[in-house]
Amino acid sequence: MDAFQDHYPDSVAHCYGCGSRNPHGHQIKTVWEGDETVTRFRPEPFHTSVPGFAYGGLIASLIDCHSTGTAAAAMYRQAGRDMDSLPAFRFVTGSLHVDFLKPTPIDGELVIRCRLREIKGRKVVVETTV
């Protein structure tokens, strides 16, 4: 299954979190699994906050890019359109709230999951967990 980011045109593929054309970024890949989206990411040692744990900014960055990709995919799905069709649906984050419930170990795979909560016009609300 193609990741959402595989459908981004080169002109918008420079994002630090999800851009395939940014060699220094996370280059996340997001796919549908039923009614939710999933990204899998393995932190590197340079993502450390304190020994053994991932930096909180990394978590927020992963949530941000995973969520905007989900918003676009949800709009395509609602419209019954292919993700390569024009005009393109693109989103930026209007609000990001993260509750850090416990430190995130750096030595394993992070699984980011997102569910659509609401589409109202051009506004898409999602809920994401790591």
Roles of regions detected by a PLM:
Residues 1-10, 103-130:
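HotDog/MaoC-like acyl-thioester-processing domains
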Residues 1-51:
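Non-catalytic linker/capping segments at the edges of enzyme domains
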Residues 27, 93-95, 125:
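Hydrophobic residues on conserved beta-strands that form the core of alpha/beta folds
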Residues 27-29, 99, 113-115:
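Short, surface-exposed charged micro-motifs
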Residues 34-36, 93, 109, 123:
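A general secondary-structure signal for short beta-strands and their flanking turns/coil
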Residues 38-74:
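A conserved, well-ordered hydrophobic junction motif at loop->secondary-structure transitions
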Residues 39-41, 98, 114, 128:
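Preference for bulky hydrophobic residues occupying beta-strand positions
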Residues 70-111:
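Hydrophobic beta-strand-centered segment that forms part of the acyl-chain substrate-binding groove
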